[in-house]
From Swiss-Prot:
Region (G4 motif) location: 343-346
Disruption phenotype: Produced cells are larger and a large amount of them contained more than two nuclei.
Region (G1 motif): 129-136
InterPro entries: Dynamin, Dynamin_GTPase, Dynamin_N, G_DYNAMIN_dom, P-loop_NTPase
One MF term in the entry's GO annotations: microtubule binding
Positions of the UniProt region annotated as G2 motif: 155-157
Protein name, as recorded: Dynamin-like protein C
Residues forming coiled coils: 44-102, 781-811
SUPFAM superfamilies given in the database record: P-loop containing nucleoside triphosphate hydrolases (SSF52540)
Biased composition (Low complexity): 183-213, 877-891
Stretches with biased composition (Basic and acidic residues): 67-90
């Protein structure tokens, strides 16, 4: 017997003896005082004493049992926490090597795809939520380091797009911002062109091609370096730089937002290749205009179907009162591409008193079946070094987990939903799926390139063996004729050029045309088809529509009172002021300054659109193997000669059209026809001198919507006071608005008559005449050089074929490794399911299969360790749904079958 047990026995014996003695003393006293007390009463007293003794004994035993249970529970909690901590530590070391292998592998695949012009999209996450829901802290946890953006309100005014690039050589984060042009921005701008809705290689939204055109994904080899700042920004200066860029675009008042994103490129050895969008927070109250602008901006960001939405809500907000989730549901009704995350869980977990209350909360209310949210807490401390930040995240997670264990929550049921590590693992799995979804199509495209290269080699060899001047002349004339016809078809409207490949959105057109932007234009009008990839006549017509919006948005320039006073001179025959003459002079000068530059820009943009058709037409004709004359497209020197004549023709009509337009502008402004203006009812008079951007926007929309409004009479005055100044300026502004309206219509007509029509009527004869008049010597010079070019091209094609086959085999090797890993995981899954039914519902394989069928579920709760090929990759037939998720049939592909690619 232990010392404690002996002591307890002694206490019980002592207490029992004391109680018995007390009762005995009382009884003896009673007997002595009452001789009539019988033995039955004595027995009752003894029984009562024994009962009291037993009750006291039970209480002591209950206290001891409770104390033992608490000690056992505490020991179990400590053991589980230590196991969880060890699991986290082990996963860090394992993932450090396995993920690095994966990143390196997919970097190679992305570079191969880039070299062969194959689409290989970088996955994208869009983080949305209310203000103070912890969006920036969540992003920091994915990045692995803090940059203190959460201490400011800058995230509420401009989207921040972080392009994470895995770079093994960067053991510390390397951060660079994308260059920005603030020349057309001003503090009062509420928004700008819709540059934030789009995706990589998704043609309905290609204007925001951050993965390719803006430089994201796949390592720095794919980046257009001149779009990024030459210098790196230290991590501790990121916040200051983001604030500066935000204020430059939206002003310092804090009451404006801009849809133009800030791009931040982060190269780091310990991150995935991923684009993350940090969005302005939804507003619950305050300025209704600001709430609406933010809501619309975020909707545009989450609309692209390829983007994964991370919807954050604070854990202390009741399920029925959530705001972000209903807004996201409007865009993603079944949450098929949405991850639900409840932040600041540490504020909620301390309110959970028992197992039942914990389970009720963790199950969630009003959420689609099988859609389980994550619950995370993140460190509150700021300015932590990278390794301390990781340790703080670990301790924060373990603290939440400890509190849940203490109230006995079901680990098997809810463990996979707790902590940032489960979210990160889940996101990693999704990234692997996205990469794998790219793998098979890329492999098929590589095989197609191999076959095309083999066919090109055959064509070049045949052309080299059959080459003489007479034959080449005939081929050239047929090719030129077909080329002219193809240009006409592209202008009239045709999809033969593949808009997905050759089309441009309005943003892409502006970025690639090398033409200066519209001066002083900073509005987000709904330009027709601006988000669609167009070429030819459709792209030209979109430009004219944009031009009308631009010219109507031009306001009468600020005019000083000195200018007005100087413009009111004297007549040859009298000294009476002529206000109409003063207003006319001011109007003529200001109109030339504001409107004339637009002529140059619209003509240069028109020429750019027409010049693009050369490459499109040559590509179409070169793919037509049924026409033997199209083999002349193999001769680079001939194509350069043809392109030279084609662009010479465009430059000629551009010059002629510019001359006519400027002459017409002089005609319109030289002599003012007041009767013409007085009959104009489309323009409603307004204060031409003080116009806000919002008023300009509404006025342009009303004009473009053809609303009929009233006119205004002229007025006179003699004194050069403020009233006279206002009247003269209003007259000049009235003249300006009239010319602005009529001239926009005139330019459209002139462009169609003197720029577009010659492309139909004169281009064919111009190019045909040129080549028909070339002498034999010129042909010999042109095609003798072409023979050397063909020989060089043959060598390049042969080398390309070798390289392409090597890369194709590399893709096959990756695929086989994934398939092998899948089989191993399936075997492990089968084994574990026989031991535990609950764990089989949460393993990684089933999670992936559910995700690929459009449902995201909870990641594996039993392990944070993930090999680089945990995700399954099966049957090649992709069935694309409306939400752009992919179903994959379950039988594995045998790509090693020699006839596989022939069958597909």
């Amino acid at each position: 017997m232990s010392h404690q047990q002996q002591q307890a026995h002694f206490d019980i014996s002592s207490n029992s003896t004391l109680t018995t003695n007390t009762i005995a003393t009382t009884t003896n006293a009673s007997v002595s005082s009452s001789p009539q007390l019988n033995k039955a009463q004595m027995a009752i007293a003894e029984a009562m004493a024994l009962k009291m003794h037993e009750e006291e004994k039970k209480k002591r035993e209950e206290k001891k049992r409770k104390r033992d249970n608490e000690e056992l529970l505490s020991k179990q909690v400590r053991t589980k926490l230590e196991n969880e901590r060890k699991k986290l530590d082990d996963s860090e070391s394992i993932n450090a090597s396995t993920n690095q292998e994966l990143y390196s592998l997919f970097n190679d695949l992305q570079m191969i795809s880039h070299d062969h012009n194959i689409s290989f999209d970088t996955p994208e996450l869009v983080v949305v939520g209310m203000q103070s829901d912890g969006k920036s802290s969540f992003i920091e946890s994915l990045l692995g380091f803090q940059f203190n953006i959460v201490e400011t309100n800058i995230g509420t005014r401009r989207p921040l797009i972080i392009q994470m690039i895995n770079n093994p050589s960067k053991q510390q984060p390397s951060c660079r911002f994308k260059k920005e042009d603030y020349s057309n921005s001003y503090g009062g701008s509420s928004s700008s062109t819709s540059t934030t809705s789009g995706n990589s290689n998704h043609n309905t939204d290609k204007q925001q091609n951050v993965s390719s055109s803006q430089g994201g994904g796949g390592g720095s080899n794919n980046l257009n370096e001149d779009k990024w700042e030459e210098y790196e920004t230290p991590v501790n200066e990121l916040t200051e730089e983001i604030i500066r860029r935000t204020n430059e675009r939206t002003g310092r008042a804090g009451d404006r937002v801009s849809s133009i994103p800030i791009f931040l490129r982060v190269e780091f050895a310990h991150c995935s290749n991923l684009n993350i969008y940090d969005t302005p927070g939804f507003r619950k109250g305050g300025d209704e205009r600001l709430k609406y602008e933010i809501s619309e901006m975020v909707k545009k960001l989450i609309e692209p179907k390829n983007r994964i939405i991370v919807c954050l809500e604070q854990s202390n907000v009741e399920w029925a009162n959530t705001i972000s989730r209903p807004l996201v549901k409007k865009i993603d009704p079944d949450f098929s591409r949405t991850i639900l995350v409840n932040t600041k869980f540490d504020n909620r977990v301390k309110e959970l008193r028992n197992r039942e209350s914990a389970h009720k909360y963790l199950e969630g209310e009003g959420i689609i079946a099988q859609k389980k949210p994550f619950f995370i807490s993140l460190p509150l401390k700021r300015n932590l070094e990278t390794h301390r930040f990781k340790d703080a995240m670990k301790e924060t997670f373990l603290d939440d987990y400890r509190k849940l264990l203490e109230i006995g929550f079901d680990e098997n049921r809810f463990g996979g939903q707790i902590g940032i590590y489960k979210v990160r693992q889940y996101v990693e799995n999704l990234l692997h799926e996205k990469y794998q979804q790219n793998l098979l199509p890329s492999m098929l495209q590589l095989e197609s390139i191999c076959k095309k290269t083999e066919a090109d080699i055959v064509r070049v060899k045949k052309e080299l063996s059959d080459n003489n001047i007479v034959t080449l002349k005939e081929k050239v004339m047929r090719f030129v004729s077909n080329f002219n016809g193809q240009i006409e078809r592209l202008l009239e409207g045709s999809v033969v050029g593949d808009p997905d490949e050759f089309g441009q959105t309005l943003l892409q057109e502006k970025e690639n045309c090398s033409v200066q932007p519209w001066p002083g234009y900073n509005f987000d009008f709904d330009i027709q088809n601006s988000n669609y990839s167009l070429y030819g006549g459709a792209q030209y017509e979109r430009l004219l529509n944009e031009f009308e919006f631009v010219i109507h948005s031009k306001e009468f320039p600020e005019t000083s009172i000195n200018e007005v006073a100087s413009a009111i001179g004297v007549s040859k025959s009298h000294n009476s002021p002529i206000y109409e003459l003063a207003a006319t002079n001011i109007f003529q000068t200001k109109s030339k300054k504001v409107l004339l530059p637009l002529i140059d820009i619209v003509l240069q943009r028109s020429s750019y659109i027409m010049k693009r058709l050369f490459d499109i037409s040559v590509s179409i004709l070169g793919k037509d193997e049924n026409e033997s004359s199209h083999t002349v497209s193999l001769y680079e020197h001939f194509l350069k000669e043809l392109q030279s004549q084609y662009e010479k023709f465009i430059q000629t009509i551009e010059s002629e059209c510019k001359s006519r337009l400027k002459d017409d502008f002089e005609m319109f402004t030289k002599i003012v026809d007041w009767n013409l203006l007085s009959g104009l009812t489309e323009i409603k008079p307004y204060n031409y001198l003080k116009v806000s951007p919002e008023e300009t926007k509404q006025r342009v929309i009303s004009i473009m919507d053809c609303k009929k409004l009233e006119d205004e009479p002229l007025s006179r005055s003699r004194n050069i006071d403020d009233d006279t100044y206002q009247k003269v300026c209003m007259i000049a502004g009235r003249l300006f608005s009239g010319i602005r309206f009529f001239f926009s219509k005139l330019i459209r007509n002139k462009l169609n008559a003197f720029f577009l029509d010659p492309m139909f009527q004169k281009l064919g004869s111009f190019v045909t005449d040129y080549f028909s008049k070339l002498n034999d010597q010129k042909y010999e010079e042109m095609f003798q050089l072409g023979l050397k070019e063909l020989e060089n091209k043959l060598h390049k094609l042969e080398f390309q074929l070798i390289d392409c086959k090597k890369n194709r085999d590399k893709f096959k090797d990756v695929y086989n490794r994934m398939k092998q890993s899948l089989n191993q995981n399936q075997n492990q899954n089968s084994s574990s399911s026989s031991n535990s039914a609950s764990s089989s519902n949460n393993n990684v394989i089933i999670k992936h299969q559910q995700s690929l069928n459009g449902k995201f579920s909870t990641p594996d709760k039993n392990s944070l360790t993930m090999s680089p090929f945990t995700s399954p990759f099966t049957q090649s037939n992709y069935h694309q749904h409306n939400n752009n998720n992919y179903q994959i049939n379950q039988q594995p592909l045998d790509i090693n079958n020699d006839h596989y690619f022939d069958q597909n």
